Amino acid sequence: MTTSTPRERLLEAAGELFHRDGVNIGVDALCKAAGVSKKSMYQLFRSKDELIAESLASRGPSYQALLHPGPEDERPARDRILTVFERQDELVAQGDFLGCPYVSTAVELKNPEHPGSVVARHFKQHLTDFFHRELVKAGAEDPGTLAIQLTMIFDGASARAVVRAQDLGGIGVLTAAALLDAAGVRSSELATQAG
Protein backbone atom coordinates (compact mmCIF):
# COMPACT_ATOMS: atom_id res chain seq x y z
CA MET A 1 0.00 0.00 0.00
CA THR A 2 1.41 3.37 -0.98
CA THR A 3 1.06 6.31 1.33
CA SER A 4 0.80 9.68 -0.33
CA THR A 5 3.18 12.39 0.77
CA PRO A 6 1.97 15.55 2.56
CA ARG A 7 2.64 17.47 -0.67
CA GLU A 8 0.49 15.07 -2.72
CA ARG A 9 -2.30 15.21 -0.13
CA LEU A 10 -2.22 19.01 -0.15
CA LEU A 11 -2.34 19.16 -3.95
CA GLU A 12 -5.22 16.68 -4.07
CA ALA A 13 -7.22 18.43 -1.33
CA ALA A 14 -6.52 21.84 -2.86
CA GLY A 15 -7.65 20.71 -6.29
CA GLU A 16 -10.92 19.36 -4.93
CA LEU A 17 -11.67 22.15 -2.44
CA PHE A 18 -10.65 25.07 -4.65
CA HIS A 19 -12.83 23.77 -7.47
CA ARG A 20 -15.79 22.87 -5.25
CA ASP A 21 -15.70 25.70 -2.70
CA GLY A 22 -13.56 28.35 -4.37
CA VAL A 23 -10.02 29.58 -3.91
CA ASN A 24 -10.97 31.68 -0.89
CA ILE A 25 -11.38 28.59 1.27
CA GLY A 26 -9.34 28.97 4.45
CA VAL A 27 -5.92 27.44 4.94
CA ASP A 28 -7.17 25.73 8.12
CA ALA A 29 -9.90 23.86 6.23
CA LEU A 30 -7.47 22.98 3.47
CA CYS A 31 -4.86 21.61 5.88
CA LYS A 32 -7.51 19.68 7.79
CA ALA A 33 -8.78 18.04 4.59
CA ALA A 34 -5.22 17.09 3.63
CA GLY A 35 -4.27 15.91 7.11
CA VAL A 36 -1.31 18.30 7.12
CA SER A 37 -0.33 21.04 9.56
CA LYS A 38 -0.20 24.68 8.44
CA LYS A 39 3.49 24.70 9.27
CA SER A 40 4.04 21.77 6.90
CA MET A 41 1.98 23.47 4.20
CA TYR A 42 4.10 26.60 4.33
CA GLN A 43 7.27 24.50 4.30
CA LEU A 44 6.06 22.84 1.10
CA PHE A 45 4.54 25.91 -0.59
CA ARG A 46 5.69 29.51 -0.16
CA SER A 47 2.11 30.76 -0.18
CA LYS A 48 -1.48 29.77 -0.74
CA ASP A 49 -1.18 31.43 -4.15
CA GLU A 50 1.60 29.01 -5.07
CA LEU A 51 -0.54 26.10 -3.88
CA ILE A 52 -3.44 27.31 -6.05
CA ALA A 53 -1.18 27.42 -9.10
CA GLU A 54 0.47 24.07 -8.44
CA SER A 55 -2.83 22.33 -7.74
CA LEU A 56 -4.18 23.55 -11.09
CA ALA A 57 -1.00 22.51 -12.89
CA SER A 58 -0.98 19.06 -11.30
CA ARG A 59 -4.55 18.36 -12.43
CA GLY A 60 -4.04 19.62 -15.97
CA PRO A 61 -2.79 16.46 -17.66
CA SER A 62 -5.59 14.27 -16.28
CA TYR A 63 -8.24 16.89 -17.15
CA GLN A 64 -6.90 17.10 -20.69
CA ALA A 65 -6.88 13.31 -20.98
CA LEU A 66 -10.58 13.31 -20.05
CA LEU A 67 -11.38 15.64 -22.94
CA HIS A 68 -8.89 15.17 -25.76
CA PRO A 69 -8.87 12.11 -27.98
CA GLY A 70 -5.56 10.29 -27.70
CA PRO A 71 -2.88 10.10 -30.36
CA GLU A 72 -4.05 6.57 -31.24
CA ASP A 73 -7.39 8.04 -32.41
CA GLU A 74 -6.95 8.33 -36.15
CA ARG A 75 -10.38 9.66 -37.03
CA PRO A 76 -10.71 12.82 -39.13
CA ALA A 77 -9.96 16.15 -37.44
CA ARG A 78 -13.64 17.16 -37.32
CA ASP A 79 -14.52 14.01 -35.37
CA ARG A 80 -11.59 14.50 -33.00
CA ILE A 81 -12.69 18.09 -32.33
CA LEU A 82 -16.29 17.07 -31.69
CA THR A 83 -15.05 14.39 -29.27
CA VAL A 84 -14.03 17.18 -26.87
CA PHE A 85 -17.62 18.45 -26.80
CA GLU A 86 -19.08 14.95 -26.51
CA ARG A 87 -16.84 14.26 -23.52
CA GLN A 88 -17.84 17.59 -22.01
CA ASP A 89 -21.48 16.45 -22.28
CA GLU A 90 -20.56 13.20 -20.53
CA LEU A 91 -18.84 15.05 -17.67
CA VAL A 92 -21.85 17.33 -17.22
CA ALA A 93 -24.26 14.37 -17.27
CA GLN A 94 -22.49 12.83 -14.27
CA GLY A 95 -24.35 15.34 -12.12
CA ASP A 96 -21.50 16.86 -10.11
CA PHE A 97 -20.08 19.11 -12.83
CA LEU A 98 -18.74 22.40 -11.48
CA GLY A 99 -17.48 23.91 -14.72
CA CYS A 100 -14.03 24.15 -16.18
CA PRO A 101 -11.63 24.38 -13.22
CA TYR A 102 -9.36 26.77 -15.12
CA VAL A 103 -12.06 29.25 -16.08
CA SER A 104 -13.65 29.02 -12.62
CA THR A 105 -10.35 29.79 -10.89
CA ALA A 106 -9.38 32.64 -13.22
CA VAL A 107 -12.82 34.25 -12.87
CA GLU A 108 -12.70 33.97 -9.11
CA LEU A 109 -9.16 35.35 -8.84
CA LYS A 110 -9.92 38.37 -11.07
CA ASN A 111 -6.20 39.02 -11.44
CA PRO A 112 -4.55 37.94 -14.70
CA GLU A 113 -1.10 38.11 -13.07
CA HIS A 114 -1.98 35.78 -10.17
CA PRO A 115 0.03 32.53 -10.45
CA GLY A 116 -3.25 30.57 -10.61
CA SER A 117 -4.52 32.72 -13.48
CA VAL A 118 -1.26 32.21 -15.35
CA VAL A 119 -1.62 28.42 -15.03
CA ALA A 120 -5.31 28.62 -16.00
CA ARG A 121 -4.45 30.59 -19.13
CA HIS A 122 -1.73 28.07 -20.00
CA PHE A 123 -4.13 25.12 -19.85
CA LYS A 124 -6.89 26.96 -21.71
CA GLN A 125 -4.32 27.67 -24.41
CA HIS A 126 -3.66 23.91 -24.60
CA LEU A 127 -7.29 23.40 -25.62
CA THR A 128 -7.12 26.17 -28.22
CA ASP A 129 -3.84 24.71 -29.52
CA PHE A 130 -5.43 21.26 -29.82
CA PHE A 131 -8.28 22.72 -31.87
CA HIS A 132 -5.80 24.68 -33.98
CA ARG A 133 -3.69 21.60 -34.79
CA GLU A 134 -6.77 19.64 -35.81
CA LEU A 135 -8.09 22.51 -37.94
CA VAL A 136 -4.76 22.80 -39.74
CA LYS A 137 -4.94 19.05 -40.48
CA ALA A 138 -8.46 19.57 -41.84
CA GLY A 139 -7.30 22.42 -44.08
CA ALA A 140 -9.47 25.08 -42.41
CA GLU A 141 -9.10 28.52 -43.95
CA ASP A 142 -8.56 30.47 -40.70
CA PRO A 143 -7.60 27.89 -38.06
CA GLY A 144 -6.47 30.49 -35.51
CA THR A 145 -9.82 32.28 -35.33
CA LEU A 146 -11.79 29.06 -35.57
CA ALA A 147 -9.80 27.50 -32.71
CA ILE A 148 -10.59 30.49 -30.49
CA GLN A 149 -14.28 30.26 -31.42
CA LEU A 150 -14.35 26.56 -30.51
CA THR A 151 -12.73 27.32 -27.16
CA MET A 152 -15.38 29.97 -26.54
CA ILE A 153 -18.11 27.43 -27.29
CA PHE A 154 -16.50 25.00 -24.84
CA ASP A 155 -16.23 27.63 -22.10
CA GLY A 156 -19.73 28.92 -22.74
CA ALA A 157 -21.18 25.42 -22.58
CA SER A 158 -19.35 24.82 -19.29
CA ALA A 159 -20.75 28.04 -17.84
CA ARG A 160 -24.26 27.22 -19.07
CA ALA A 161 -24.11 23.78 -17.45
CA VAL A 162 -23.17 25.31 -14.10
CA VAL A 163 -25.64 28.22 -14.21
CA ARG A 164 -28.57 26.10 -15.38
CA ALA A 165 -27.54 23.10 -13.25
CA GLN A 166 -28.63 20.68 -15.95
CA ASP A 167 -27.28 18.58 -18.79
CA LEU A 168 -26.19 20.36 -21.93
CA GLY A 169 -28.34 18.16 -24.14
CA GLY A 170 -25.68 18.14 -26.83
CA ILE A 171 -25.79 21.91 -27.42
CA GLY A 172 -21.99 22.23 -27.34
CA VAL A 173 -21.59 19.44 -29.91
CA LEU A 174 -24.32 20.91 -32.14
CA THR A 175 -22.90 24.44 -31.93
CA ALA A 176 -19.34 23.29 -32.63
CA ALA A 177 -20.59 21.16 -35.54
CA ALA A 178 -22.47 24.14 -37.00
CA LEU A 179 -19.34 26.27 -36.75
CA LEU A 180 -17.25 23.57 -38.42
CA ASP A 181 -19.90 23.18 -41.15
CA ALA A 182 -19.87 26.92 -41.81
CA ALA A 183 -16.08 26.79 -42.10
CA GLY A 184 -16.25 23.81 -44.48
CA VAL A 185 -14.56 21.42 -42.04
CA ARG A 186 -16.14 18.06 -42.72
CA SER A 187 -15.21 14.50 -41.87
CA SER A 188 -13.91 12.47 -44.80
CA GLU A 189 -17.22 10.60 -45.08
CA LEU A 190 -19.22 13.84 -45.27
CA ALA A 191 -16.79 15.38 -47.75
CA THR A 192 -17.11 12.31 -50.01
CA GLN A 193 -20.93 12.45 -49.89
CA ALA A 194 -20.95 16.21 -50.58
CA GLY A 195 -18.49 15.88 -53.50
What are these regions (language model features)?
Residues 9, 13, 17-54:
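Helix-turn-helix
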Residues 115-121, 136-195:
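Hydrophobic/aromatic-rich alpha-helical bundle segments in the mid-to-C-terminal region
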Residues 92-118:
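Amphipathic alpha-helical segments used for helix-helix packing
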